[in-house]
Amino acid sequence: MAKESYKREKPHVNIGTIGHVDHGKTTLTAAITKVLSEKGQAQKMDFDEIDKAPEEKERGITISTSHVEYETPSRHYAHIDCPGHADYVKNMITGAAQMDGAILVVAATDGPMPQTREHILLAKQVNVPSIVVFMNKVDIADPELIELVEMELRELLSSYGFPGDDIPIIQGSALGALNGEAEWVGKIEELMEAVDNYIPTPVRDVDKPFLMPVEDVFSISGRGTVGTGRIERGVIKINEEVELVGIRPTKKSVVTGIEMFRKLLDQGEAGDNAGLLLRGVNKDELERGMVIAKPGSITPHTKFKAEVYILKKEEGGRHTPFFNGYRPQFYFRTTDVTGSVNLPDGVEMVMPGDNLSIEAELIAPIAMDEGLRFAIREGGRTVGAGTVTSIIE
C-alpha cells in the first residue's frame, strides 16, 4: 500500500525536431529513442520506422507526422518528426502537433540553410516558446567551421527574437550515437538534459482561464438558456460569472447549472463536453461561434495578422492563385466568418502551396488571442490554414 504515494505523474511536454532537409532530424529522433531505451525510458525506434510517417488529417489538411514517446527522470515527452519540409510548415501552422519546445537540428557541415531560417521564423510566428539546438555531424566537420556555425546560429536565432546567446547548443553526431559510440551517446544525454532544463514546463489547459466555444444553444422553459460545447481550457464552477464573447456585443452572465452526459455537476474542466445553464440570457443572445469565458480573459476582434498555409491543388485546395482583397470564410473554433485578405507589400498573388503572412479583416468580431488557429474555407471546403500572430483591432 505504501508504494502508491510515490506514483507521481511526470509533467508532459510536447516537442519536435525541426531544421533543414538531410541535416539529421530523423536520425537524431532515432538516436534519442535508442539511447533512452537502454535506460528503460523509451521504446527504441529505427530510422525507417520513424521515416515512414503515417498521414493524418487536421482541419482538412493531410500531414505526415511521426510520433515518438520517451521519458527522462523528470518528464514525459511526446516527440514529433516530419518527413518533408511541407509537412513541418503545415504542422506548425495548423497546430496539429502543438509544440512546447523544439530541437533545431543543424548540420555543422552546412550551417544554417534556407529551411533552417524558415523553421525558426515559423517557430516564432506560431509561438513555439523555446528552442534547443543540436549541431549534428560534428564528427565530419572542420573544427574551425564548427565555431563559425555556432556564432552564425546564435545571431540567426537572435534576429528572429529568440535569446540566441542563452540557447543551449549541443555539438554531436546523431549517427555516431545510433551506432553506439560512447562519445556521441554522451552528447544525446547532454541534449536531453538541456531539453529538460531549458524548455519550460507548459501550463496545463486546466490551469488557464476558462473558455468554452459554443457549439449549440438550447432553451429550457422556465430555466433559461444552455450553451453546449467542449471546454477548451480552465475550470468552471456553479455560480461563477462568465462573459459571452464574439459576433454580438459582449454580455455578462452567471452559470447556474453544469450538465454533462445528462448528469448535473458542480464543475466542468478542460476536455469535458458540457452544457452550461446561463442566467438572464435569451436564446437569441447566444449562438454557435461565440465563446463562454472567464470575464476579461479574451476579447472580440475583427482585424489581425496571421501566418497562413494555402493548400496545393493535389491536397484538395484551390486550382488557381488568389489576389489582394480575396474574401474566403475563416473558420474559428466552431463557425465560419467571412473576411477579406490583405497581402503584404510586394506580393501580387498567392499560389496554391504557398505559406505567407497576411492581414485579415472579418465582417463580425470573433473572440481571439495570439496563437489561435483557424481554417480558410470556400463554401465549406478547406483551402488553407492559419495562426493568428498579432491582433490589430
From Swiss-Prot:
Keyword Transcription: no
Reactions accelerated catalytically: GTP + H2O = GDP + phosphate + H(+)
Stretches the record annotates as G2: 60-64
PROSITE patterns: G_TR_1, G_TR_2
Keyword Magnesium: yes
Coiled coil: none
Alphabetical list of InterPro entries matching this protein: EF-Tu_GTP-bd, EF-Tu_GTPase, EFTu-like_2, EFTU_2, G_TR_CS, P-loop_NTPase, Small_GTP-bd, T_Tr_GTP-bd_dom
Compartments, as annotated in UniProt: Cytoplasm
Origin: domain of life: Bacteria
Binding site for GTP: 19-26, 81-85, 136-139
Residue ranges, annotated region (G1): 19-26
Keywords assigned by UniProt, alphabetized: Cytoplasm, Elongation factor, GTP-binding, Hydrolase, Magnesium, Metal-binding, Nucleotide-binding, Protein biosynthesis
A molecular-function term among this protein's GO annotations: translation elongation factor activity
Region (G4), start-end ranges: 136-139
HAMAP family (UniProt xref): EF_Tu_B (MF_00118_B)
UniProt subunit comment: Monomer.
Function comment: GTP hydrolase that promotes the GTP-dependent binding of aminoacyl-tRNA to the A-site of ribosomes during protein biosynthesis.
Identification of the protein by name: Elongation factor Tu
